[in-house]
């Protein structure tokens, strides 16, 4: 983009400035070092777009406008992620009477394993529980120290 960078605030209502979860396996399994820039770009885009839904349609003709990467780069990234077993394609057929066959094929992509929407949501729930437990422990400890 042409706008100045603004750090994400992580607010639920501000979808475009929200954080997304990057599983620690991204680092421990060396994906950051072994994937090409094209695959990394697509991985990060799909991670962001699948925070609340299991897959996303990547329209190659729109990717330049939306993310600043070419359709060719998206295709290369998808192929590499599929070969690595990190992403899977889900075809959806929709009725379109203006199409030759009366249907149009849509390519949706979802991440697999620890990168999947479901797995990341589960990890966020566990982290949230742990954080709340730690906060309660700190509050109890502070209350006990205040009484002393």
Report residues per predicted region.
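Short, cationic-aromatic polyanion-contact patches
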Residues: 1-14, 93-120
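Short, low-complexity, polar/charged sequence segments that are solvent-exposed and flexible
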Residues: 63-64, 108-109, 128-132
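Charged low-complexity intrinsically disordered patches
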Residues: 113-148
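Short recognition helix of helix-turn-helix/winged-helix DNA-binding domains
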Residues: 1-61
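Winged helix-turn-helix DNA-binding recognition segment
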Residues: 50-105
């Amino acid at each position: 983009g042409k706008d100045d960078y603004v750090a994400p605030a992580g607010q639920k209502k501000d979808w475009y400035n929200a954080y997304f979860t990057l599983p620690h396996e991204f680092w421990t399994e060396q994906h950051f070092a072994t994937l090409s820039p094209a695959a990394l770009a697509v991985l990060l885009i799909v991670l962001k777009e699948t925070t609340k839904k299991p897959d996303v349609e990547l329209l190659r003709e729109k990717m330049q406008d939306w993310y600043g990467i070419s359709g060719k780069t998206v295709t290369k990234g998808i192929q590499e992620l599929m070969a690595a077993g990190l992403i899977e394609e889900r075809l959806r057929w929709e009725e379109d009477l203006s199409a030759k066959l009366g249907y149009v094929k849509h390519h949706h992509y979802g991440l697999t394993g620890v990168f999947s929407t479901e797995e990341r949501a589960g990890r966020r729930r566990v982290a949230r529980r742990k954080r709340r437990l730690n906060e309660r422990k700190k509050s109890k400890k502070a209350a006990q120290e205040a009484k002393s």
